[in-house]
Regions:
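Transmembrane-helix bundle of Major Facilitator Superfamily
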Residues: 2-141
């Protein structure tokens, strides 16, 4: 793909990057809403519920720099696609098969790992696709 085509599609690419981030962040928000049901269905106590919330954030924050380096080494697009696949697959499998709070905590940690792949990949793709004079606007959106 030549530079002119990439430049012409930069706003579409920004939309896809934004959607990718929304997908990963919605995983965190939706769990908040589901906590009462998780407590009832899994018999989780307050400590386990807290870990269900925090496992994602702790792994995401701890692995963000490492996964950014992985994306630099193996490619931005593969990192983005792998991260989205991990988040989506683990979400689907957890919803279908999780029977204990420990399963959900482990799954949330894996989702945090996938999200840690997505975040730096989206930002690095935006930096490559947008010219310097438009990068601030693109990152702000």
């Amino acid at each position: 793909m030549d530079a002119q085509k990439v430049h012409e599609r930069r706003w579409l690419i920004l939309g896809v990057m934004s959607l990718s981030l929304v997908i990963t962040l919605l995983n965190n928000v939706t769990v908040n809403v589901a906590l009462p049901e998780l407590s009832k269905d899994l018999g989780a106590d307050n400590t386990e519920l807290q870990w269900i919330m925090d496992a994602y954030v702790v792994v995401f924050g701890g692995m963000l720099l490492v996964m950014g380096a992985v994306g630099d080494r193996f490619g931005r697009k593969p990192a983005l696609m792998m991260g989205l696949a991990v988040v989506g697959l683990v979400s689907a499998l957890t919803a279908q098969y999780a029977t204990t709070s420990e399963h959900v905590i482990g799954a949330r940690a894996l989702m945090g790992l996938g999200a840690a792949l997505v975040m730096p990949a989206t930002l690095s793709i935006i930096v490559v696709v947008f010219p310097p004079e438009e990068r601030g606007k693109a990152v702000g959106i």
